[in-house]
């Protein structure tokens, strides 16, 4: 078994940096009445997906969580999915 690491240097894997989907020129506004937009940031169990997975900025994640909670309170979104 030959050691390939000595003959070939391994290149590090560079992951593309994710950008916030709510920042930019034509980015959608976070609104508690926009149920279709909010459902993209809720897991199939009904939990809010963390920003490290969705790449939403910290400020927009707080706005998103507030909008989801407001929509749940008004009955537009379910609290849990069975």
UniProtKB/Swiss-Prot annotation:
Highest classification ranks of the organism: Bacteria, Pseudomonadati, Pseudomonadota, Alphaproteobacteria, Hyphomicrobiales
Record protein name field: Small ribosomal subunit protein bS18
Function: Binds as a heterodimer with protein bS6 to the central domain of the 16S rRNA, where it helps stabilize the platform of the 30S subunit.
Coiled-coil residue windows: none
Entry keyword annotation includes Manganese: no
Family, as annotated: Belongs to the bacterial ribosomal protein bS18 family.
The keyword Ribonucleoprotein appears for this protein: yes
A Gene Ontology BP annotation from the UniProt entry: translation
Gene responsible for this protein: rpsR
């Amino acid at each position: 078994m030959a050691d390939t690491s000595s003959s070939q240097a391994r290149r590090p894997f560079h992951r593309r940096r994710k950008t916030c989907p709510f920042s930019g020129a034509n980015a959608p506004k976070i609104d508690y009445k926009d149920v279709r937009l909010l459902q993209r940031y809720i897991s199939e169990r009904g939990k809010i997906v963390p920003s490290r997975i969705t790449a939403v900025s910290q400020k927009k994640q707080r706005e998103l969580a507030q909008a989801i909670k407001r929509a749940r309170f008004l009955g537009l979104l379910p609290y849990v999915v069975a």
